[in-house]
C-alpha cells in the first residue's frame, strides 16, 4: 500500500495566510488582555503605511524607488509580539 505525503489542498474555504496570522495574533492577545493595545498600535501602523504608499524619494541618492511592502500577516504578528511584550511589563 502506497502512502502519499501530506498535501495542502486550497479550496474556496481556505483562508488567506494574512487572515490566519491575524487570528493567531488576536487570540494570543485576548488571552493576555492586550486587545486595546493591539488595536491602537494597529491603527498607528495603518496610518504609517498609508503615508508610505506608492513611490518614495531617496535624499541620499536622489532616486525614485518603489517602496517595499510588509506582508499584512507579518505585520500583524509583529505588532502582536510587541503589544504582548509591553502588556507583560505593565
From Swiss-Prot:
Which keywords label this protein?
A: Nodulation
Listed name of the protein: Early nodulin-36A
Query: Could you name the domain of life of the organism this protein comes from?
Result: Eukaryota
What organism is listed for this UniProt entry?
Answer: Glycine max
| One GO-annotated biological process of the protein | nodulation
Amino acid at each position: 500500500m502506497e502512502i502519499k505525503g501530506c498535501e495542502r489542498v486550497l479550496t474556496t474555504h481556505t483562508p488567506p495566510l494574512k487572515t490566519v496570522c491575524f487570528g493567531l495574533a488576536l487570540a494570543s492577545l485576548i488571552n493576555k488582555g492586550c486587545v486595546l493595545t493591539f488595536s491602537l498600535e494597529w491603527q498607528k501602523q495603518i496610518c504609517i503605511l498609508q503615508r508610505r504608499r506608492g513611490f518614495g524619494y531617496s535624499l541620499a541618492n536622489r532616486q525614485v524607488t518603489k517602496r517595499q511592502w510588509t506582508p499584512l500577516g507579518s505585520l500583524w504578528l509583529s505588532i502582536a509580539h510587541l503589544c504582548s511584550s509591553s502588556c507583560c511589563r505593565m
